[in-house]
Amino acid sequence: MQQMVPASGYDRAITIFSPEGRLYQVEYAREAVRRGTTAVGIKCKDGVVLAVDRRITSKLIDVSSIEKIFQIDDHIVAATSGLVADARVLIDRARLEAQMNRISYGEAITVEALAKKICDIKQAYTQHGGARPFGLALLITGIDRHSARLFETDPSGALIEYKATAIGSGRPIAMEVLESKYSEDMTVNEGMELALYALSKTTEELKPENIDMAIVKDSGKLVEKISVDEIEKIVKAVYKKVEAEEAEAEKNKGEEDIE
């Protein structure tokens, strides 16, 4: 885990820059994201995929009450990592912005326009005293009149578009997997398998009931939540692939030892 440098008093107000040009409260908010659940987003040739490991910590928790993926509009879905209460506020605001766009302009909001509106709100909370930044990162994705889009927003209000990305505590490991295995030609079905494969590398055991997953396909342009039964099938396929890779690695190691 990255160690935070002593702030020498410059972290007492959100509006004060340190001599190095840093806003420590924003960096602390990013730390909340780094401790959050891992979410993976993948843009495919026929749609987009979001998957989140909800990381259920107690068997007494009702799994159905823990949401990490939220439908914003018919064609837009978002995944969150960070403070749950902050997520609720921004998701509600995103839904409101989508509704207002339909009422004002008679059409659905684009994925990019919605992502920018949320980032504007996040950025404003880095400038005003008496408030704190949102300790939350969002993956906002969907299909609009342009094409499939996938955006990541961070607590500073920065907005970056990706082909595939991850947020949360498992981001470094998941990004290594995505960078090595992602292809722009992959289908949504292949994207779902890759997303769960990346999540499997960030946890000791990937449990289907702990996974939240959604897709949006080019054909229908509608958000579709993936059932636990379907996720279980994909998880089994993922672990078969992992076992095959481990067996191949063990075989190669044995051949090297012989040489």
Curated annotation (Swiss-Prot):
The formation of the proteasomal ATPase PAN-20S proteasome complex, via the docking of the C-termini of PAN into the intersubunit pockets in the alpha-rings, triggers opening of the gate for substrate entry. Interconversion between the open-gate and close-gate conformations leads to a dynamic regulation of the 20S proteasome proteolysis activity. GO terms for molecular function: threonine-type endopeptidase activity. GO terms for cellular component: cytoplasm; proteasome core complex, alpha-subunit complex. The keyword Mitochondrion does not apply. GO terms for biological process: proteasomal protein catabolic process; ubiquitin-dependent protein catabolic process. It holds the Pfam family Proteasome. Keywords: Cytoplasm, Proteasome. It comes from the Archaea. InterPro entries: Ntn_hydrolases_N, Proteasome_alpha, Proteasome_alpha-type, Proteasome_asu_arc, Proteasome_asu_N, Proteasome_sua/b. The keyword Transcription regulation does not apply. It is found in: Cytoplasm. HAMAP family: Proteasome_A_A (MF_00289_A). The 20S proteasome core is composed of 14 alpha and 14 beta subunits that assemble into four stacked heptameric rings, resulting in a barrel-shaped structure. The two inner rings, each composed of seven catalytic beta subunits, are sandwiched by two outer rings, each composed of seven alpha subunits. The catalytic chamber with the active sites is on the inside of the barrel. Has a gated structure, the ends of the cylinder being occluded by the N-termini of the alpha-subunits. Is capped at one or both ends by the proteasome regulatory ATPase, PAN. Component of the proteasome core, a large protease complex with broad specificity involved in protein degradation. Belongs to the peptidase T1A family. This is Proteasome subunit alpha.
